[in-house]
């Protein structure tokens, strides 16, 4: 399934729920998937990494983008699987619907965005290197890609390798995706360590 990752077993990107992803996401979910402390940490990460006045791509997004409210961007492009959720996001200047597991090609021009994000959704990608390679294509040289994740997911839709790896190993997996997609200066971070009352949060950052 993933020729770019031959060291992983062939079943690494299978899912328990094999139904089409658009069916699973057909009903809008106006909820957040991490607690307020983790959301604040994501926002602070974006505040530091994403340039004001730039163009931001929020991949696998929903009705909230966790971008710093005081920062103005030239454009925030949303992507997701449920139009009601995307339409409700006040930060999106435009959005597109796309099942990345069926088609990883982004409908965006080469070198057209300054920053990209995936927040608590990377575990659902069945062709992560192909998607990350597309992100690198649309990023301007030196553009930043921030992937954040916690210990929560829809388990029937997460890929097998994500469910089987210990929490601390997910950063290595995402770093591998970035490396195979051609990103440079890959930096894993423990943003909120596990064992605290708050939701844990990890980030992996790559530069195009």
Q: Can you describe what each PLM-predicted range is?
A:
Residues 181-184, 191-208:
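Core SAM-dependent methyltransferase catalytic element
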Residues 114-129:
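A short SAM/SAH-binding and catalytic strip from SAM-dependent methyltransferases
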């Amino acid at each position: 399934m993933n020729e770019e990752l031959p060291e992983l077993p062939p079943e690494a990107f299978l899912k328990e729920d094999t139904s089409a992803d658009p069916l699973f996401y057909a009903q809008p979910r106006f909820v957040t998937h991490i607690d307020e402390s983790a959301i604040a940490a994501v926002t602070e990460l974006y505040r530091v990494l994403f340039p004001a006045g730039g163009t931001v791509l929020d991949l696998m997004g929903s009705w909230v983008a966790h971008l710093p409210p005081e920062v103005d961007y030239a454009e925030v492009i949303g992507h997701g699987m449920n139009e009601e959720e995307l339409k409700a996001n006040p930060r999106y200047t435009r959005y597109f619907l796309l099942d990345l597991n069926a088609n990883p090609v982004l409908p965006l021009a080469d070198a057209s965005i300054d920053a990209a994000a995936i927040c608590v959704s990377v575990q659902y990608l069945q062709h992560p290197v192909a998607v990350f390679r597309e992100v690198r294509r649309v990023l301007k040289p030196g553009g930043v890609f921030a992937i954040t994740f916690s210990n929560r997911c829809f388990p029937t839709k997460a890929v097998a390798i994500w469910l089987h790896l210990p929490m601390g190993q997910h950063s290595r997996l995402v770093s591998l995706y970035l490396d195979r997609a051609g990103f440079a200066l890959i930096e894993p971070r423990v943003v909120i360590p596990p064992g605290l009352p708050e939701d844990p949060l990890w980030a992996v950052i790559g530069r195009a």
